[in-house]
A protein has these predicted regions:
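Hydrophobic ligand-binding cavity/cleft-lining segments
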Residues: 1-51
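Hydrophobic residues positioned within well-ordered beta-strands of beta-sheet architectures
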Residues: 13-15, 57-59, 71, 97, ...
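Hydrophobic-ligand binding "helix-grip"
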Residues: 37, 63-108, 116-118
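Short Pro/Gly-enriched beta-strand edge/turn motifs at strand-loop
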Residues: 41-43, 52-55, 79-85
Length: 151
């Protein structure tokens, strides 16, 4: 039974990167949701569902620290964005994230990773996790940029 008297904290993280590439090139990389060589400290990723893309796809990401995060795709808009929820593996009660892309007037692609999350951890732990998540997004997006622009 859940204790509804526990203090909860909600927060968000948002980071973006500009990539010199076509919409098609960036989407091709982002839409391969188990090919995550650009994801910071990712060890391996595999499908847990028969479905391999689109809403209802489930993946399991294993990290170098031994943690595993199960994610379910809940939105899929080709060449625009996808959203997912984390079911297990994070110190959170809820986590929803979207990775989106948009062509800018300069012809570059702006990739944005943003999330909303809720925790019942102590405020200090929650704030530390929020900072960690922002750094994780920044590093991963820089890896994505380097990966795309050098290939």
């Amino acid at each position: 039974m859940r204790n509804f008297d526990v203090e909860k904290h909600a927060g968000s993280a948002k980071r973006s990167v500009m990539i010199k590439a076509s919409v098609e090139t960036v989407w091709k990389k982002l839409s391969k949701i188990t090919k995550l060589g650009w994801l910071e400290e990712q060890k391996s990723t595999k499908f847990l569902s028969q479905k391999k893309h689109g809403v209802g796809t489930i993946r399991l990401i294993s990290f170098e620290d031994g943690s595993n995060v199960e994610e379910h795709i809940v939105e899929w808009s080709p060449k625009k964005c996808f959203s997912y929820i984390a079911i297990t593996g994070l110190p959170l009660l809820a986590y929803l994230a979207t990775i989106s892309m948009k062509k800018t007037s300069s012809g570059r692609i702006k990739v944005t990773w943003q999330s909303y999350f809720v925790s019942d951890k102590k405020k200090k732990e929650f704030l530390e996790f929020s900072k960690f998540l922002s750094r994780f997004y920044s590093k991963s997006l820089q890896n994505l940029k380097s990966d795309i622009e050098t290939n």
